[in-house]
Amino acid sequence: MNSGDSSLIDAVIYNHTLCDGWTNSTEGAIYHLGNTILFLGYMGGSGAYGALYIFSFLAPAFLCLALWGWLTMCGLDVFIWNLLLMLQCLAQVCHLIFRLMRDGLANEEFSALYTAVYLPLDVPVQVFKEITGAGENKVLSLAAEETYAVEGKTPIDQLSFLLSGRIRVSLEGQFLHYIFPHQFLDSPEWESLRPAEEGNFQVTLTAETDCRYISWRRRRLYLLLSKDRYIARLFSVMLGSDIADKLYSLNDKLFAKSGVRLDIRLPSLYHVLAPSPPGSEGGSASSPPRGSLGDPTVIKVDPAPSNPGSGTRNPQPDQGKNPVPKNPHQHWSSDTEMPSGEDSTSLILEDFADMTGSLMDYGHEREYLK
């Protein structure tokens, strides 16, 4: 450290006039009012509205301090600095108000929704305003364990989009999957009905935590989609992606112990997931034949040869000359007539006997999270 720096430090620390004594008098009311408003201003939160709150309080606070410096302290420097700070706060307030009016977003939740979902899709702000306006720019709430829809009772008359929280989806008390933020609550129900049709929910939706969501009435949203093709295509893409995510969330729960994942679209899994008809032992006595058109979830499979040595690579000599055509309408008379002597349901259940993580294994969502 050179001598110049040391002399400056000594001048700051030692070469100054000490206070002879503390005065018992206090500053005027304007000074204390300014500091009180300043204290309240720094209690604002984050985000655009939090900044608007802070600068709206700081501007009158610095105005009071500027008046205090002009009237009480009679100090030009005190007055000028506080006046400059007040002008800067007013400029920030004007900028924030202009930005909020330009964006046209009703609250902070809509702003976060636009930034997270619609901005990556290059959706203009004006289009987003039309979409939220169709839902009356309202954000609805669900308390924990409050029911959004009950299976077989709640009509399908709206479409909702989750902003925060978590929704539990169940069927007859059996947990299916969760709905997370930025997902539709009832996209499958929306796509299952035509505009003129009516129906009820087939699943129960319950709030796992405190939730916030926006909702559109069915008729009003259909009117918007019929008028604007861009919004209609946007909703078509978002709904299709949401339904695919829900299907994959169910599909991810089906996996075997060996690590091989099973596809929920496999026809053979229908017997595992679907309840057996009452009064039937294996679920096959009252089921239609495998080749019938009434069961689209079951496909016809040719039986495996009983002799492992007689495969397609070793045909009989006479079969090469006079091949016997197969009847395309041939099917098993019932599920009990299988080559192995077992009914189809028992065969499928044995195939998936070691399966863990299926839909039938989770009695509660806490087990699903383990």
From Swiss-Prot:
Segments of skewed composition (Low complexity): 283-294
Subcellular location: Membrane; Cell membrane, Sarcolemma
Tissue-level expression: Expressed in the heart and, slightly, in skeletal muscle.
GO cellular component terms listed in the entry, alphabetical order: sarcolemma
UniProtKB keywords: cAMP, cAMP-binding, Cell membrane, Membrane, Nucleotide-binding, Transmembrane, Transmembrane helix
The organism's place on the tree of life at top rank: Eukaryota
A Pfam family assignment: POPDC1-3
Effect of deleting the gene: Morpholino knockdown of the protein affects skeletal muscle development, resulting in abnormal facial and trunk muscle formation with defective aligment of muscle fibers and establishment of myotendinous junctions. A severe defect is observed in craniofacial muscle development, where many muscles are malformed or reduced in size. In the heart, pericardial edema is prevalent in the morphants with defective looping and misshaped chambers.
Biased composition (Polar residues): 307-319, 330-347
Region Disordered, annotated ranges: 275-349
One Gene Ontology term of the molecular function aspect: cAMP binding
Membrane spanning residue stretches: 51-71, 78-98
Membrane topology summary: Multi-pass membrane protein
Main location per the UniProt record: membrane
Protein's GO biological process: cardiac conduction; heart development; heart looping; regulation of membrane potential; skeletal muscle tissue development; striated muscle cell differentiation
Annotated function: Important for striated muscle differentiation and cardiac morphogenesis. Is also required for cardiac conduction system development, plays a regulatory function in heart rate dynamics mediated, at least in part, through cAMP-binding.
Record-stated family: Belongs to the popeye family.
Protein name: Popeye domain-containing 2
UniProt lineage: Eukaryota, Metazoa, Chordata, Craniata, Vertebrata
Gene: popdc2
